């Protein structure tokens, strides 16, 4: 369970980072 939770967290975190990066580029690029 811990491994699955960690994996899910990593995938969600990666998605959030990508979304944040795209938003940053749109705002400041």
Curated annotation (Swiss-Prot):
Q: Please report any disulfide bonds recorded for this protein chain, giving both cysteine positions.
A: none
**Membrane topology, as annotated:** Peripheral membrane protein
| Superkingdom in the source lineage | Eukaryota
Chief subcellular location equals plastid
Q: Which GO terms describe its cellular component?
A: chloroplast thylakoid membrane; proton-transporting ATP synthase complex
| BP terms from Gene Ontology | ATP biosynthetic process; proton transmembrane transport
Where does this one sit in the cell?
Plastid, Chloroplast thylakoid membrane
The protein's enzyme class: translocase
**GO terms assigned for molecular function:** ATP binding
Q: Which UniProt keywords apply?
A: ATP synthesis, ATP-binding, CF(1), Chloroplast, Hydrogen ion transport, Ion transport, Membrane, Nucleotide-binding, Plastid, Thylakoid, Translocase, Transport
Annotated EC: 7.1.2.2
What does it catalyze?
A: ATP + H2O + 4 H(+)(in) = ADP + phosphate + 5 H(+)(out)
Q: How does it assemble?
A: F-type ATPases have 2 components, CF(1) - the catalytic core - and CF(0) - the membrane proton channel. CF(1) has five subunits: alpha(3), beta(3), gamma(1), delta(1), epsilon(1). CF(0) has four main subunits: a, b, b' and c.
Any idea what job this protein has? Answer: Produces ATP from ADP in the presence of a proton gradient across the membrane. The alpha chain is a regulatory subunit.
Q: Which family does it belong to?
A: Belongs to the ATPase alpha/beta chains family.
Instruction: From the Swiss-Prot or TrEMBL record, give the protein name.
Output: ATP synthase subunit alpha, chloroplastic
Q: List the source organism.
A: Bryopsis maxima
């Amino acid at each position: 369970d811990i491994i699955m939770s960690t994996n899910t967290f990593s995938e969600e975190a990666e998605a959030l980072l990508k979304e944040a990066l795209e938003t940053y580029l749109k705002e400041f690029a």
